[in-house]
């Protein structure tokens, strides 16, 4: 883009609303989601209470839905990385909840009040038995950043809302998984992708 507004484009609505984020390093959450015009005038901006990333969509109701980061403590799984974590004082026994896992939450904001009126968290619907064991995400240099430890567990990077099916689709990069979610119940209809220890993948695990 051009001009003094550092806008990142994600997608557009059927009504040709342009949706994305604006880069603003003065903010704690430096990529607030925005609905903007072709002239880069802001039509709507999410409240920036949480870190939004990768996708923002406008629903047929006029409300907005996006992907935000959420976290909770979880175990460090047993693996080739175990001894390295233990050297830094972690138990790293595969079951002690001692390490920050960063997951994702799908959030719907009211278009007028910007209040969260619906949400869905991976921590409520995915098993922490499932993680990327082959992509290097548990290697120590992937989880440590200037002494700030965190594990990028799910990394949801795409969101689609289907009014016809009353469903939300998400793509979860680090689990190699696509999930269909019933809206508004939040029930997982199916998971498609790599087979993992929980057995929660229903189809596509032989692709």
Regions found by a protein language model. Give the residues of each.
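Secretory-pathway ectodomains
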Residues: 1-207
């Amino acid at each position: 883009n051009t001009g003094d507004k550092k806008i990142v484009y994600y997608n557009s609505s059927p009504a040709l609303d342009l949706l994305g984020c604006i880069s603003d390093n003065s903010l704690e959450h430096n990529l607030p989601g925005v609905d903007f015009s072709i002239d880069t005038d802001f039509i709507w901006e999410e409240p920036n209470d949480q870190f939004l990333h990768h996708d923002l969509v406008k629903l047929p109701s006029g409300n907005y839905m996006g992907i935000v980061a959420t976290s909770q403590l979880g175990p460090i799984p047993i693996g080739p990385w175990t001894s390295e974590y233990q050297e830094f004082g972690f138990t790293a026994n595969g079951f002690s909840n001692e390490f920050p896992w960063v997951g994702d939450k799908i959030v719907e904001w009211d278009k007028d009040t910007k209040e969260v009126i619906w949400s869905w968290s991976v921590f409520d619907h995915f098993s922490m038995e499932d993680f990327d064991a082959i992509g290097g995400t548990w290697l120590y240099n992937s989880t440590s950043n200037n002494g700030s430890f965190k594990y990028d567990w799910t990394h949801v990077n795409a969101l689609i809302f289907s009014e016809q099916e009353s469903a939300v689709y998400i793509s979860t990069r680090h689990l190699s998984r696509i999930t269909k979610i019933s809206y508004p119940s939040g029930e997982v209809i199916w998971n498609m992708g790599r087979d993992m220890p929980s057995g929660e993948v229903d189809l596509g695990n032989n692709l």
